Amino acid sequence: NKESKYSPMAKEWYRLLDGMYEENCNISPVSFYKTSMIIANQNDIEFGFYNQNDVQEFLVFFIDSLHESLCKKVGINITGSIKNDLDKIAFECMTKWKEYFKNCYSKIIELFYGQMASFIDVEGEIKSRTYNPICFFALPIANKKDITLYDCFELFTAPELLNGDNKWFNDKDNKYYEANKRTVFWKFPNVLIISFKRFNN
């Protein structure tokens, strides 16, 4: 996408990769680094102001930049008929996916983005459904011995009681309700990027 303000990022990344596969070649990422800083500063991204940042912040910025430089409008068609509740959720997920990416889709989305579904349950009735794309999975670490990655995913998706000051607000009637929040992974990306939350608040 030549019109994208992020295109220089993709070009510098290509040059860097191209040089890495050359024989007897010295590699310096200075040009790639400078281009990253310029693009970040131009877009008011905190990463670009030479402050201390971690690799997660840069990786999100980098993936988003590649996506913006490569994306284009696409036609996304949803076919099939709704026969049960699961089909209804699938249709809603795909509809949201289409809304997010129909005007800006790239191979980066296919590789690095998944989708999460969150449900708000009040007295046994689902009152709210949200479907969001996700690129980076920040998993909590289970407080037990011999933990596995599956334990961390289970903790990440554990049901959450919304009560007290954290009650769910229903904008249809402008009231707060005690509710249960449930989160599931609807679609995993082909490349799963995970970080672990090492600290508790």
Can you annotate each of these PLM segments?
Residues 1-201:
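UBL (ubiquitin/ubiquitin-like) substrate-recognition surfaces
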